[in-house]
A protein has these predicted regions:
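N-terminal capping segment at the start of a domain
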Residues: 10-26, 183-185
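Terminal amphipathic helices with adjacent charged low-complexity linkers/tails
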Residues: 57-58, 240-249, 253-331
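A short, small-residue-rich loop immediately preceding and capping a beta-strand
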Residues: 24, 60-61, 112-115, 142-160, ...
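Cofactor-binding active-site loop characterized by glycine-rich and histidine/acidic residues
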Residues: 34-172, 383-384, 415, 522
């Protein structure tokens, strides 16, 4: 605890916030002013962190879920002494190239744990971090991993649908080291929260198994005491802090306009006078800055003791900690997958079950792998020999998310951002839209999150068009920096998994059918991954110079091969190109792409989805065999015939263009 009055320490956050917003002419300043005491209590008395080692493995995590109030976080990081958050960064708030973006963007070296983006994502990210901590605490022991995850939460976060999902699941799993600090200012962009919300929020959390406390006004001592009580309770905690938005800004505090109205120099001068603040823009008195810097050094002794404990571990355990901290996979994981590819060659299996077999093999080699699905274990088979992660068993490696796809996706990102674990989430492709914010933010952050999907087309049959995701492949491929894999058989499944796990700069989606995948690759050679270039010639023309090129993914590769056989028998030299990952194919040089696509040939693409995106590969004279609208109910084989996704249809398209 500092010997400086904490009130002016909180006011330093206010001053830096209003100066940054006034300088740029915009910004959401109301939340930082209202939550300044909450943040001061947390960062000066409870949060365990070390700006000299920002990525300390056993640091507490802080997530600003209400990210529009980002200047609160930036001010805290500057005040506590993060080298990557100098005062000059705050002066460039909301400018191109600044680390101080309008909403926080992940920069662990500067203390920004995660890009929270849209409201609600951050609270689920925080739950994922708390889950990762609970598992690692079991795996490595409390002497190596034992920390809390805090989130600053606004009214909007709690109104989002994902909030209901994650409140329920976190309470069920008793994630006791998860603490949410609710900035309960009862104001949002449209005005009074009562216009849209009337439930008893405290009762809502208690009903879900949370520890709930309420703190009045801007009382630093009361907030600190509540945090201490939360840390001692085995349940996840909500601390409802009744605040005033824009506190300290004369004429605007408590008003709707305090959310984000434009500030003038007259406003900032009035705030300085109200707070008794000396100095010009961005000036923090030395005694107050020194007190904040001491707060930033508060955990130095704990950090040093932790470092000594790690150094004294037996060599094998010390190596494991180092590997997990660095995000490296164990030796032999790649060889395990390639061995599986050789075993899967020539074998038929339900597509998603190939992935389930692969995950079971990976889990045996990778102790940090955590699997899970939203009430779809029987349909996707990604649990197998794994046992459930529960409130009673923190060593379980399968998470039963319940029907909570949105929470699952955001929690996966939180786990990956936390580090030390390799989580995967499995669901039907039609539910991908519930995870879309997660994909987008993972891609933006460059997080290597792995998403697995099943039931990928009209091939699911009688469940009908509501569950036949004809448009979703195209929408996933539209997301920058995300790799979308649609393997054609067990060999390509193993190759896709290898590529997804090896990738460290962005997320991957692995997409499988419910129906069986027959073998399209008769063998898999050791050390060979044909999918690594995104697309490759699976079967070259054998009847002379190539005249036609058939392009396909997933289940439709087999249809293309059947069409090729008929065309070749009729004297049309035809090649089949499997395209498991468009994004990797786009990374290849022009010579390779042309050698695969052969632009001078007739090109026909085959995919049980909409055409969007295929024209870049088939060209202006090419054709597409697939879906042009939604599906319908019927047996899978009949549906393929009904919609004309057949070898005969492919042959007709080729002949029409020769």
């Amino acid at each position: 605890m500092s010997d400086v009055d904490p009130k002016p320490m909180a006011d330093a956050i206010r001053i830096l916030t209003i100066d940054a917003c006034e300088r740029v002419g915009e910004g959401h300043w109301g939340t930082p002013l209202g939550a300044a005491e909450i943040a001061t209590a947390l960062f000066t008395r409870h949060l365990r962190f070390n700006p000299a080692d920002p990525t300390w493995f056993d640091r507490d995590r802080f997530v600003q879920s209400n990210g529009h109030g980002s200047m609160l976080l930036y001010a805290l990081l500057y005040l506590t002494g993060y080298a990557h958050m100098p005062l000059s960064a705050l002066k460039s708030f909301r400018e191109i190239g600044s680390i101080c973006q309008g909403h926080p963007e992940r920069a662990p070296e500067a203390g920004i744990e995660i890009t929270t983006g849209m409201l609600g994502q951050g609270i689920a990210n925080a739950a994922g971090m708390a889950l990762a901590e609970a598992y690692l605490n079991h795996l490595l022991g409390p002497e190596i991993v034992d920390h809390h995850t805090y989130a600053l939460v606004g009214d909007g976060c709690l109104q989002e649908g994902v909030a209901h999902e994650v409140i329920s699941l976190a309470g069920h799993l008793r994630l006791g080291k998860l603490i949410w600090l609710w900035d309960d200012n009862q104001i949002q962009d449209d005005g009074d929260v009562a216009q849209a919300t009337s439930e008893d929020m405290d009762a809502r959390f208690r009903a879900a198994g949370w520890h709930v406390q309420r703190v009045d006004r801007h009382d630093i001592e009361a907030v600190s005491a509540a945090i201490a009580a939360a840390k001692g309770d085995p349940r996840p905690s909500l601390i409802a802090c009744r605040t005033v938005i824009g506190s300290g800004m004369p004429g605007l505090e408590g008003a709707r306009s305090a959310h984000s109205c434009r500030l003038t120099r007259e406003n900032t001068d009035a705030a300085r006078a109200r707070l008794g603040w000396q100095g010009g823009p961005f000036a923090v008195p030395q005694d107050i800055l020194d007190a904040w810097r001491r707060a930033g050094r508060r955990a130095e002794a704990e950090h040093a003791a932790w470092t000594e404990r790690v150094a004294s571990l037996p060599e094998e355990r010390r190596a494991l900690v180092a590997r997990l901290q660095e995000g490296r996979l164990p030796e032999g994981w790649r060889e395990s997958l390639r061995a599986y590819a050789r075993e899967a060659a020539g074998r038929s299996e339900f597509g998603i079950f190939f992935s389930g077999e692969i995950v079971e093999r990976l889990a045996a080699a990778i102790p940090e792998l955590l699997s899970g699905a939203p009430d779809l274990e029987a349909a996707t088979k990604h649990k197998r020999s794994l046992v459930a992660f529960t409130a009673e068993n923190r060593g379980g490696r399968y998470i039963h998310y319940g029907v909570r796809e949105h929470a699952m996706g955001a929690m996966l990102n939180g786990m990956v951002a936390h580090g030390g674990v390799l989580p995967i989430g499995v669901t039907y492709l039609v539910f991908a839209d519930y995870e879309r914010p997660t994909f987008r933010l993972a891609a933006m952050m460059g997080l290597p999150t792995v998403f697995v999907f099943s039931h990928d087309s009209i091939g699911i049959g009688r469940n009908g068009p509501t569950h036949q995701p004809v448009e979703i492949l195209a929408s996933l491929r539209a997301i920058p920096n995300m790799h979308v894999f649609r393997p054609a058989d067990g060999v390509e499944a193993a190759e896709a998994w290898e590529l997804a796990l090896a990738r460290r700069t962005g997320p991957s989606c692995l997409i499988f059918p419910r129906q069986k995948l027959g073998p399209v690759r008769a063998s898999a050679t050791a050390g060979e991954n044909l999918s690594a270039r995104g697309a490759y010639v699976l079967a070259e023309a054998s009847g002379g110079a190539r005249r036609a090129t058939l392009l396909a993914t997933g289940t439709e590769v087999a249809i293309a091969l059947a069409a090729r056989a008929r065309l070749e028998a009729a004297g049309v030299a035809t090649a089949v190109v499997s395209m498991p990952c468009w994004e990797l194919f786009e990374e290849q040089d022009e010579a390779y792409r042309n050698a695969v696509l052969r632009p001078e040939t007739v090109r026909v693409a085959v995919e049980a989805a909409v055409r969007l995106g295929w024209d870049r590969y088939v060209g202006p004279e090419g054709s597409f065999v697939g879906m042009s609208g939604f599906g319908t109910t019927g047996p899978e084989e009949a549906l393929y015939r009904h919609f004309g996704i057949t070898p005969e249809a492919v042959v007709r398209e080729v002949r029409a263009r020769l």
